[in-house]
Amino acid sequence: MAPKKKKVAGLIKLQIQAGAANPAPPVGPALGQHGVNIMEFCKAYNAATESQRGNIVPVEITVYEDRSFSFITKTPPAAQLIKKAAGVAKGSGVPHTTKVGKITMDQVREIAETKKEDLNANDIDAAAKIIAGTARSMGIEVN
């Protein structure tokens, strides 16, 4: 007989600095209200994202009724990767009038390669278009 499936009690989505999860907000309160062992999650997340230090890594945590959990890490947000490539601290407040930086199409393709698994695109060209659109809406020129 197949083992019974665990019942899902909740789904938590967070964006945490890679390798730097700790019980302080926002991690602690989000997990605490679902009864998850916070330190256990922090240790597992930090171990899983150690290689990506310096990036913000989104994570989807599935909490089960027996208070156990599983999590899936995603690729860093496109906006974060674009800001790093353009060398700017933040996007423009008025993106269509004030440009804050420039990135090349090669950089856009590189970011698209990184993000491809999380994007809703069939090929790398479609993924590059999505990334270029995000860059433009941040006030960053794409050449």
Curated annotation (Swiss-Prot):
PANTHER family: 60S RIBOSOMAL PROTEIN L12, LARGE RIBOSOMAL SUBUNIT PROTEIN UL11M
Single GO MF annotation: large ribosomal subunit rRNA binding
Organism per entry: Kocuria rhizophila (strain ATCC 9341 / DSM 348 / NBRC 103217 / DC2201)
Function according to Swiss-Prot or TrEMBL: Forms part of the ribosomal stalk which helps the ribosome interact with GTP-bound translation factors.
Ribonucleoprotein listed as a keyword: yes
GO BP of this protein: translation
InterPro entries listed in its UniProt record: Ribosomal_uL11, Ribosomal_uL11_bac-typ, Ribosomal_uL11_C, Ribosomal_uL11_C_sf, Ribosomal_uL11_CS, Ribosomal_uL11_N, Ribosomal_uL11_N_sf
RNA-binding listed as a keyword: yes
CC terms in the record's Gene Ontology section: cytosolic large ribosomal subunit
Family designation: Belongs to the universal ribosomal protein uL11 family.
PTM per Swiss-Prot/TrEMBL: One or more lysine residues are methylated.
Subunit structure: Part of the ribosomal stalk of the 50S ribosomal subunit. Interacts with L10 and the large rRNA to form the base of the stalk. L10 forms an elongated spine to which L12 dimers bind in a sequential fashion forming a multimeric L10(L12)X complex.
Protein name: Large ribosomal subunit protein uL11
Matches recorded under Gene3D superfamilies: Ribosomal protein L11, C-terminal domain (1.10.10.250), Ribosomal protein L11/L12, N-terminal domain (3.30.1550.10)
Domain of life the protein comes from: Bacteria
Keyword vocabulary terms for this entry: Methylation, Ribonucleoprotein, Ribosomal protein, RNA-binding, rRNA-binding
